[in-house]
Amino acid sequence: MILIDGKKIAAELREQLRQEVVELKAKHNKIPGLTVILIGEMAPSQIYVRMKEKAANEVGLKSEVIRYPEAVEEKTVLDKIEELNKDESISGILVQLPLPKHIDKQKVIETILPGKDVDGFHPMNVGNLSSGYESSVPCTPLGCYLMIKKIEPNLSGKKAVMIGRSNLNGKPMAQLLLKENCTVTITHSKTKDLKAECLEADIIVAAVGIPELVKADWVKKDAIVIDVGINKTENGIVGDVAFEEVSKVARALTPVPGGVGPMTIACLLKNTIECFKRSQK
């Protein structure tokens, strides 16, 4: 079995991006800029933002974090986004989720200029992805897609099963695989026989938040299995796939942690650079 090493693939991608930033600076005499807005003191969000900032600096992006207290008014955040929209030195804007309850997530997402939406969550970018137009793609599915392509460059005709239908993972992942001429099935909590669906699949992407849901007898021999889940259990962090047993049947499998996570951050940097390039056309 091939262990899909997200850390290694992400490091390779970051090196490519670092070289690209050098070339862009030489060509345009400026570099892409990423601004992250962080609200409140949630520990996981603080950690994610630190990792994003470190990675951005590593590839040579201009990086800034704007921090607000938990009680910040929604208007303050929206006004700041409007200000960043107008700032030509900022290529990408990201508001770290989740947000406090008094702030409307959708309103925040829709205030970010689609051309600066590095998360790919703006309805216009969601529409662009499903219509086949160029725009930002959500970072986690993009990372999963790049890992799958690393293992199997020719995906045409493959059967792919998505477990989970979220706007964040399931739906955009399905669109990316459809573009590659996969036959895609999106499954979810109401799917009648999930195991039977999975047994048909050449590619399984599990993003449903149920610890070790996907067992060895759900996976056909030589399938590629991507585990997006991060679940805290008594035995530590586990994914949505029972790693030990599935590793005995799968052709390739991502670990948790160290699989999808590093690629998500690398793809955020990729999206920022792509936003910059589109803005220079």
From Swiss-Prot:
Single GO MF annotation: methenyltetrahydrofolate cyclohydrolase activity
Catalysed reaction equations from the record: (6R)-5,10-methylene-5,6,7,8-tetrahydrofolate + NADP(+) = (6R)-5,10-methenyltetrahydrofolate + NADPH; (6R)-5,10-methenyltetrahydrofolate + H2O = (6R)-10-formyltetrahydrofolate + H(+)
HAMAP family: THF_DHG_CYH
The keyword NAD is annotated on this UniProt entry: no
Keyword Transport appears in the UniProt entry: no
Pathways involved: One-carbon metabolism; tetrahydrofolate interconversion
Domain of life of the organism encoding this protein: Bacteria
Name of the coding gene: folD
EC number: 1.5.1.5, 3.5.4.9
Disulfide bonds: none
Keyword set, alphabetical order: Amino-acid biosynthesis, Histidine biosynthesis, Hydrolase, Methionine biosynthesis, Multifunctional enzyme, NADP, One-carbon metabolism, Oxidoreductase, Purine biosynthesis
Subunit architecture: Homodimer.
Record's function text: Catalyzes the oxidation of 5,10-methylenetetrahydrofolate to 5,10-methenyltetrahydrofolate and then the hydrolysis of 5,10-methenyltetrahydrofolate to 10-formyltetrahydrofolate.
Entry's Gene Ontology cellular component terms: cytosol
Family listed: Belongs to the tetrahydrofolate dehydrogenase/cyclohydrolase family.
Amino acids binding NADP(+): G164, R165, S166, S189, I230
Name this protein carries in UniProt: Bifunctional protein FolD
One GO BP annotation of this record: L-histidine biosynthetic process
One Pfam short name: THF_DHG_CYH
